[in-house]
Amino acid sequence: MRTEYCGQLRLSHVGQQVTLCGWVNRRRDLGSLIFIDMRDREGIVQVFFDPDRADALKLASELRNEFCIQVTGTVRARDAKNVNADMATGEIEVLASSLTIINRADSLPLDANHVNTEEARLKYRYLDLRRPEMAQRLKTRAKITSLVRRFMDEHGFLDIETPMLTKATPEGARDYLVPSRVHKGKFYALPQSPQLFKQLLMMSGFDRYYQIVKCFRDEDLRADRQPEFTQIDVETSFMTAPQVREVMEALVRHLWLEVKGVDLGDFPVMTFAEAERRYGSDKPDLRNPMELVDVADLLKSVEFAVFAGPANDPKGRVAALRVPGGAQLSRKQIDDYGNFVKIYGAKGLAYIKVNERAKGLDGINSPVAKFLTADIVDAILERTGAQDGDMIFFGADNKKVVADALGALRLKLGKDLSLTDEDKWAPLWVIDFPMFEDDGEGGLTAMHHPFTAPRDMTASELKTAPEEAVANAYDMVINGYEVGGGSVRIHNGEMQQTVFGILGINEQEQREKFGFLLDALKYGTPPHAGLAFGLDRLTMLLTGTDNIRDVIAFPKTTAAACLMTEAPSFANQAALTELGIQVVKKAENN
């Protein structure tokens, strides 16, 4: 039906007769001439109808936005004064000789100027996806998956599918359960990841595996989360953690070079401890120049319990955050930032405004100055590198609260004061995470997942001091987003059972949930390691959007609903009866 795409016509096509198929993006009726912007997935081209082709001109008078049409015509160069530099096809236009209206469109539920609520965009997603910027994002996503497949194939990885209907295993989030009709009362789970299957593939001898795969997690959503999402899933045998990182870094550098024309260079490597200490986050945004600086040793003897208490507490921390040019902040802005850090558990926000450093105490403005000597202030300013016109904010509490509060404040200030370089790419690897973290109930939970191997510890050493264990794990972070994470896996049965025990999984439960894995570990399991990238998040970064729903064709809302199909929906009673399921209505409060 077509010979060319609208958006691909150029000066090289001048004089050629072409047939185009697409939609009316905009129509301008000048009486004797009618112009339309005609759109398809590749872009927009201007088509015009003149009186010499009377039949086509008459039919064109009926055109309205989003009519689906076919046009045959001749490509012509535009006059110099009519060239549109903002359009890829702006140097040419098509003189139509014939027009076919394939399908008409009713009045549109979406605003023609694209000023629409997200609810409307999701309800009429098939119309929203016609917008050039949305089409471009999905085209970029397709390009990314194609580049990934070629790269992985060239590096000896095998694309192997793993099951969608599997067994529920604890991986940190709730499972989506699927009832079995044949085995009444039993349920499959949709996979949160192919984690165990890809490890079993390594045990099967496949050596290098990858898969672009759907995963499912029934968890509370955020702007960058979806209940179903896509992973670039990778596993290798006989490769060390640095070797895995080298290959995966090469993949990401390849993507950025091909999609953005940007060479990311070598990725720096930073430990979890350093990232938390300097940036208050395990996924630091290195485009932001501000860093947290420890000053507890300078404040142990001050007559100010807010500082002295945490400074003398082994579990406490006092840190300073220098804000270049921050002395310009008003009292209201400072109060607003003080309220902001309370979200993260901080009790408030002490500060020092540096007006004229050379004047010592007389050159600063601070509500805590009366508790500080000139020497202490000078030492703080020296350590933080403060200059005239800067602001120093303080965090004083337990280590987690200080890291969370100042880390979040750092990001907010970086954005609010334009200190973060939005035109820069800042990738890094974060390694050496704690193996376990406090579950808040007196026990431990795996920071990554229970199949991650510890660094340089035997099973007996791990059992003796689990809180000291460092995981042989690694995350890739770009511009403050965790885009991928992985680890070296446990390939020893004793170690795996030890980890399960530390996590409070008794032997009976181990056999019930992971018996197949424990059995497989008995038969010559190779050392193996892997990683998974979030394809949605990678695409989000590569297309420059901050909303993950913009890079998924048919996403869910933050309430995990599809407004277009109205899923989830109630099942009919016959289907429920066949499955042996009874829906229990929630009791109403009297």
From Swiss-Prot:
InterPro entries this protein is in?
A: Aa-tRNA-synt_II, aa-tRNA-synth_II, aa-tRNA-synth_II/BPL/LPL, Asp-tRNA-ligase_1, Asp-tRNA-ligase_1_N, Asp/Asn-tRNA-synth_IIb, AspRS_core, GAD-like_sf
Q: Show the GO MF annotations.
A: aspartate-tRNA ligase activity; ATP binding; nucleic acid binding
Q: What's in the keyword line of the UniProt record?
A: Aminoacyl-tRNA synthetase, ATP-binding, Cytoplasm, Ligase, Nucleotide-binding, Protein biosynthesis
What reactions does this protein catalyze? tRNA(Asp) + L-aspartate + ATP = L-aspartyl-tRNA(Asp) + AMP + diphosphate
Major localization listed first in the record, in broad terms: cytoplasm
For L-aspartate, which residues are the binding ones? Answer: E171, R217, H448, R489
- Positions of ATP binding: R217, D218, E219, Q226, E482, G534, L535, D536, R537
Q: What is its EC number?
A: 6.1.1.12
Q: State whether it acts alone or in a complex, and with which partners, per the record.
A: Homodimer.
State what protein this is by name: Aspartate--tRNA ligase
Q: Where does this protein come from, organism-wise?
A: Salmonella agona (strain SL483)
